[in-house]
Each structure stands twice: as structure tokens, then as C-alpha cells.
């Protein structure tokens, strides 16, 4: 099994990583932890102690890099959302509540960035991305929905209170994906959003089918490499 050899080698745990290396590390941790969650939920597989140590070190590295960025809200963007989710996912696999608390703090910082604009809502850092603004909104909301869902299943009511703003953002992103012209529009012609950037949608639609039902077809088409593939079957039971 590849994960065993990666753990033995301590893959991606080096201290001195470039900015791009740090980005890759958090995305890798997200996909890795989510695949571990799927394996634990759907098979008899269990994480070994060596793999736990490796996962713990990866999460530590992500937190060390991401924590200072929370003091710079002018920089805080989708990268930070993904860092928070990656650490939360690792915390769920490791059963380490402190990591969930750290991730929750990052979640609320992100929720605070949701801003009304022209009949819809935007994330200002992502709205500044020119022709890819809509695409980046789809990418950015994915870790937020995953944190809200995982948090809800673990005693953190992240869809409630200010978290209700996530519903407006989800609706706006679906409008972007559908190219229906509703809500916010940008001056520059936008790149179409590929289905794999909508990996969050099956999770959200399962909990809130009356809000944003999935279009007819195979929900697996919304799988993403950043989430370890499709999430359509991971959280089917609503607590």
C-alpha cells in the first residue's frame, strides 16, 4: 500500500519548503486524510502508528506555516481555508480535538470575509482574480463546506450563526457554475468552472437537498484530487 511507504519515508514533512511546497503539502494532507476517512468508514482498514505519526507531523507543518497568516487578513484567502480543512481532516483521523479547534478558528475568519455585492455575495480575495474569479470561488468554498459538514457531525455547529452566510455563498457559486447570470457578475469574461471544482456540492446537497439539489446525473463527476476523489458516498447518513 502506497501510504505505508510514504509514511515510512516521511513524505512531504521537510521543514524548509517553498511557498509552492507549502501549498502542495496542505493539499496533499487534505486528500490523504480524506482517503483515510473513507477507508475507515467503508472498509476494515485502520491507520497504523507509523502512519499516525506521519499524519501528525504533516498537520504540524501545515499549522506552523498557516498560523501566522491569520494575523494578515489582507492576505487570508483560499490557501488558508484549505490549510484549516486539511488540519481538521487530520484531526478527525487522529481523534485530536485540538486540531478541530484550530481549524474552527480559521473557518470563522473565512466566514467573516463573505461580503454582499450586487445581489449576491463574494469572497473579496477571490473576487480579485480576474477571469478566474468565479472558478476560485468554487475552489475556495470547498474546504469551507467540508469544515461545516465535518464540524456539524462532531459537535461544532458551523452552519449556524454567522455560518448561515455559507448558504448564500453556496448559491452564488452554483450560479457561477451554471453561468445563469444570477447574483454577482464580474466585468471580465469568466473561465467556465469544471465539475471537479464543485466537489463540495454532493456533501452540501445531501444535507440541504431543498436548497441546492444536484443536477441529474452521476454525483461522482464532482470529485476532485484535492478531496481524494468523489465525496458522494462519504457522509450519507445525516446525524
Where do the language-model regions lie?
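Short, hydrophobic secondary-structure boundary micro-motifs
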Residues: 15, 160, 185-186
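Surface-exposed patches in mature extracellular/periplasmic domains of secreted proteins
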Residues: 155-162
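Terminal, non-catalytic domain-edge segments
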Residues: 146, 150, 154, 168-172, ...
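Acidic/histidine-enriched alpha-helical segments
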Residues: 163-167
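Aromatic-lined, polymer-binding surfaces characteristic
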Residues: 1-155
Amino acid at each position: 500500500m502506497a501510504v505505508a511507504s510514504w509514511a515510512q519515508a516521511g513524505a512531504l514533512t521537510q521543514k524548509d519548503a517553498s511557498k509552492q511546497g507549502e501549498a502542495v503539502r496542505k493539499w496533499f494532507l487534505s486528500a490523504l486524510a480524506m482517503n483515510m476517512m473513507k477507508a475507515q468508514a467503508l472498509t476494515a482498514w485502520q491507520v497504523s502508528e507509523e502512519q499516525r505519526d506521519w499524519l501528525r507531523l504533516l498537520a504540524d507543518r501545515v499549522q506552523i506555516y498557516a498560523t501566522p497568516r491569520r494575523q494578515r487578513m489582507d492576505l487570508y484567502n483560499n490557501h488558508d481555508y484549505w490549510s484549516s480543512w486539511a488540519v481538521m481532516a487530520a484531526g478527525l483521523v487522529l481523534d485530536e480535538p485540538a486540531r478541530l479547534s484550530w481549524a474552527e478558528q480559521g473557518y470563522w475568519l473565512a466566514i467573516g470575509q463573505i461580503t454582499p455585492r450586487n445581489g449576491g455575495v463574494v469572497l473579496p480575495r477571490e473576487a480579485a482574480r480576474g477571469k478566474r474569479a468565479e472558478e476560485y470561488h468554487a475552489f475556495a468554498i470547498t474546504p469551507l463546506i467540508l469544515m461545516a459538514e465535518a464540524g456539524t457531525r462532531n459537535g461544532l455547529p458551523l452552519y449556524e450563526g454567522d455560518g448561515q452566510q455559507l448558504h448564500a455563498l453556496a448559491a452564488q457559486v452554483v450560479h457561477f457554475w451554471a453561468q445563469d447570470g444570477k447574483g454577482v457578475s464580474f466585468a471580465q469574461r469568466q473561465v467556465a468552472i469544471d465539475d471537479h471544482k464543485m466537489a463540495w456540492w454532493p456533501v452540501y446537497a445531501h444535507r440541504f437537498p431543498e436548497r441546492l439539489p444536484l443536477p441529474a446525473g452521476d454525483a461522482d463527476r464532482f470529485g476532485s484530487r484535492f478531496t481524494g476523489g468523489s465525496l458522494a458516498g462519504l457522509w450519507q447518513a445525516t446525524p
